Amino acid sequence: MIKHRMGRIFSSLCLGASLLAMMSTAHADGNYVNGVEGIKAASLPPPGVYWRWYNLFYKSTTLKDTSGNKSAADLNLDVFASVNRLIWITDKKFLGADYGMDLIIPLVNTNFKINNTTTDFSTFGVGDVLVEPVVLSWHGQNWDAATALGVYLPTGDYNRFDPSSPGLGQYTMMYTLGGTWYFDKEKTLSASLLSRYEIHGDRNEGDLNKGDDFHFEAGIGKKINDIFEVGIAGYGQWQMTDDSGRDAVNPTVHDRVFGIGPEVLITVPAIKSVVSIRGTSEFGGRDRPEGNMLTITLTKPLQ
């Protein structure tokens, strides 16, 4: 959504071979956006209906090449995403877990520019919708665990010649597994780890199938009082398998990135909601942009 690599750009765009390589590097494979869940990424709420509203601001002026070095491209990438998620945790049990499901609908605005060139794209639209019909969550005395199975649908507009496209033009299966551990009975100190694995289908334009992606999100949190919780959140992402198809660029190069930053959770009793504010800075990037992201999330029970 925030980032996805283009395929091969035709000569009709009047770009040289070196610029083609830069633009292909500027997009990565996966639908899932790194680092959006935070310090309790693997904890799900008790049975009920919930609305979660993510607002993401991503800025990058650094493009990493296939060796992880800073590219000569003078990148200017700005992305804003407003994402609505509806979560339903039922009172039904399966394998001892609460059974639930969720639906995620993103709105994305992307401005992609390489300075000192004619490469300048800007698009706003609905991104690829995620449907997770299977969400299982367990809650122990000092732990939480969760697993899920979902599919991204190619609902967002996709143009392989436009790196600002809000969609990826592919179906993606996503598997999720994670857990949270609480170090005290009062659950004031926690550590959480959430992993996701994406398997991508063929792009609906051109001849391209992106390699699988592995993501993890981790966090350590400390509850200060009934209002505030603070912590450190981080994430990582690796491409696990090669790209394939005639339009694959550097198919054996696997992109990656890591990020880390502070987070604060604020409980707002007046509106029965929790607000999280998180800032992350990326490092260790390869074959993709490397930037900074601010995420503001509102979670509110509807039932």
Language model segments and positions:
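Short loop/turn motifs that connect adjacent beta-strands in outer-membrane beta-barrel proteins
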Residues: 41-48, 90-100, 138-145, 183-189, ...
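Detector for outer-membrane/organellar transmembrane beta-barrel domains
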Residues: 146-148, 157-244, 278
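Residues that define the transmembrane beta-barrel architecture of outer-membrane proteins
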Residues: 47, 76-84, 120-130, 167-173, ...
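Transmembrane beta-strands of outer-membrane beta-barrel proteins
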Residues: 49-53, 97-103, 145-151, 173, ...
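Outer-membrane beta-barrel biogenesis signature
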Residues: 25-50
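Transmembrane beta-strands of outer-membrane beta-barrel pores
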Residues: 55-61, 88, 105-111, 151-157, ...
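Residues on the lipid-exposed face of transmembrane beta-strands in outer-membrane beta-barrel proteins
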Residues: 53, 84-88, 131-136, 149-151, ...
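Outer membrane beta-barrel transmembrane domains
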Residues: 203-303
